[in-house]
Amino acid sequence: MKMNLAEVEIRILGCLIEKELTTPENYPLSLNTLTNACNQKSNRAPLMDLAEADVVRGLDKLGARGLARLTTTGGRVAKYRHSLDDSLHLAPPALAVLAELMLRGPQTAGELRNRAERMTPLADIASVEEILGALMEFGPPLVTRLPRQPGRKEQRYAQLFAGEPDLPDDTPAPPPEPARQRVMAENERLARLDGEVSALRAEIASLRSTIEELRVLFE
């Protein structure tokens, strides 16, 4: 099932998972608490400034996909929870890794280990790589490994709930063919000549103006 969730929906889902793991005593979340979590300044990239109406619309779309639901158990205030543990049957470590990818975008296994530990214990980078491998083998995959960036040793991983990530084209352009190089050189030479001709014409016009002024003076 291809999800192609919008950025706001990804943020909501990541926040619901994060708060379930970090503050279970306050979970599920009220609309106000969830909105504040979405707009949180720490552990978020990019930063957002969502209104409650934006969050409601996102929750409705997630609910239609079976990824979030409303609950009023134990109180009068409507509260919201995610449904990934029900639909995907993921353990807390896998949920924490997914939440971190949703909240901060593509990251290396080392970055995920350091940042997701606030949600659940992660023994080492190898255990995170094992989790990522399982998420990549999910049907359909929930995570993908991105091509290594120029100048970086480690590869990054991205969640696929928003579809395939847009990647910058880091492939260097091939060198121009000899014929094109000759044409480019000729074009540059002609451009220089045009500039020189224009400068000479301006000088001639200035000289003519000066001569005319002198002629008027001596008449």
Curated annotation (Swiss-Prot):
Gene3D superfamilies per the UniProt record, alphabetical: Winged helix-like DNA-binding domain superfamily/Winged helix DNA-binding domain
Domain of life of the source: Bacteria
UniProt-annotated stretches for the region Disordered: 162-181
UniProt xrefs under SUPFAM superfamilies: Winged helix' DNA-binding domain (SSF46785)
Pfam families to which the protein is assigned, alphabetical: DUF480
Record InterPro entries: DUF480 (IPR007432), WH-like_DNA-bd_sf (IPR036388), WH_DNA-bd_sf (IPR036390)
Sequence similarity: Belongs to the UPF0502 family.
HAMAP family, per database record: UPF0502
Protein's UniProt name: UPF0502 protein Gura_3445
